[in-house]
Regions:
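Short amphipathic alpha-helices and their capping/turn segments at secondary-structure boundaries
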Residues: 1, 31, 89-94, 215-227
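His/Asp/Glu-enriched, well-ordered alpha-helical/loop segment
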Residues: 223-300
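Divalent metal-coordination and catalytic microenvironments
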Residues: 10, 38, 65, 144, ...
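Metal-associated gating/positioning segment near the N- to mid-region
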Residues: 2-60
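Histidine/acidic-residue-rich, glycine-tolerant segments that coordinate divalent metal ions
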Residues: 46-184
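Active-site core of metal-dependent hydrolases
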Residues: 127-242, 250-251
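Generic structural signal for hydrophobic
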Residues: 34, 65, 184-187, 221, ...
């Protein structure tokens, strides 16, 4: 069976973590660690820590992966607003830095976010779109969704109250909990793209952490009438994953891995009987099309 190389659209290529202190920082992604799991295209991002890791280092890491043969891109910014850019301008970063295709991962509905106002968030999306228009890139804002009951409120307001289309925003971690997932179905039915976060230990995150299992979530979206082209799966690779027992006891710190992509696709096919062509598109053609990655995600 021949498939395109996988597109992992959300990877902390510089490493993630740090939320428990400096000793909790996770290692960088490596060429071998990506390709051995079938990933040939990667989009790097910064997360909670936009200080100890910055845009100079992220762009340099992205360039290095490209020199090794990976098709590597990145977002400008991190969780925070105002966005910490390379050139002091979102528009300029996207226009003038070849590897930068959008902004992210901007955090909302999360205690670790900057608690941005609607106006602040809308301006980030608008500037990102303009940068994309002027450079021929996607101009996507990759949005981290947390546990707050506000869910996708800011995203929905941008789509409803401005002229900016839903195609400029890609919310991720939509399977974090049942409430957020339900809201994400509604958003996707309006045409928005959504990104599931895959897991290496699928049973743990479903049973202990109450996440929506990716294969079940995709099946539910398909049954609800969501366009299959609007769904993607990413790994949150190299991100820190605190592990707890059912009693809440801390068991240790895991690290996100791109290996979860193929595991999740297999579950879609064998557990929920989703057609292979739909399942595999979530890590190939769908992210490539949504992010305007030309020549990626398909075998032609």
């Amino acid at each position: 069976l021949l498939t395109p190389g996988f597109v992992d659209s959300h990877v902390h290529v510089l490493g993630g973590g740090g939320e428990g202190g400096f000793a909790n920082r996770t290692p960088e992604a490596t060429m071998e660690g990506l390709t051995k799991f079938g990933v040939t295209t990667v989009v790097g991002c910064l997360g909670t820590d936009g200080i100890g890791r910055d845009m100079c280092a992220l762009v340099a890491k992205t360039k290095g992966l490209n020199e090794q043969g990976m098709s590597a891109y990145c977002y400008t910014g991190s969780y925070q607003i105002p966005v910490r850019t390379l050139t002091d301008s979102i528009v300029k970063d996207i226009m003038m830095i070849q590897e930068i295709i959008g902004t992210g991962e901007i955090a909302i509905s999360d205690h670790r976010s900057s608690q941005p106002t609607f106006e602040e968030f809308a301006r980030v999306v608008a500037d990102t779109r303009l940068g994309g228009v002027l450079s021929g890139k996607a101009g996507i804002v990759n949005v981290h969704l947390g546990d707050s009951p506000r869910c996708l409120d800011l995203i929905e307001r941008v789509v409803d109250e401005t002229e900016i289309p839903a195609s400029q925003i890609l919310p991720t971690h939509i399977n974090r909990n049942e409430m957020l997932f339900g809201k994400s179905i509604e958003y996707a039915l309006k045409g928005g793209a959504v990104d599931f976060t895959g897991n290496e230990d699928i049973d743990y995150w479903e049973t202990i952490c109450d996440e929506v299992r990716v294969c079940n979530g995709i099946k539910r979206m398909l049954d609800a009438g969501v366009n299959p082209d609007r769904m993607t799966i990413s790994s949150d690779g190299q991100g820190s994953l605190p592990m707890y027992s059912s009693d809440g006891e801390f068991l240790g710190m895991g690290v996100g891995q791109s290996s979860c992509l193929l595991k999740e696709v297999k579950e879609c096919v064998f557990k929920t009987e989703i057609p292979l062509e739909i399942a595999i598109s979530t890590i190939t053609s769908n992210p490539a099309d949504i992010l305007h990655l030309k020549g990626k995600g398909k075998v032609e």
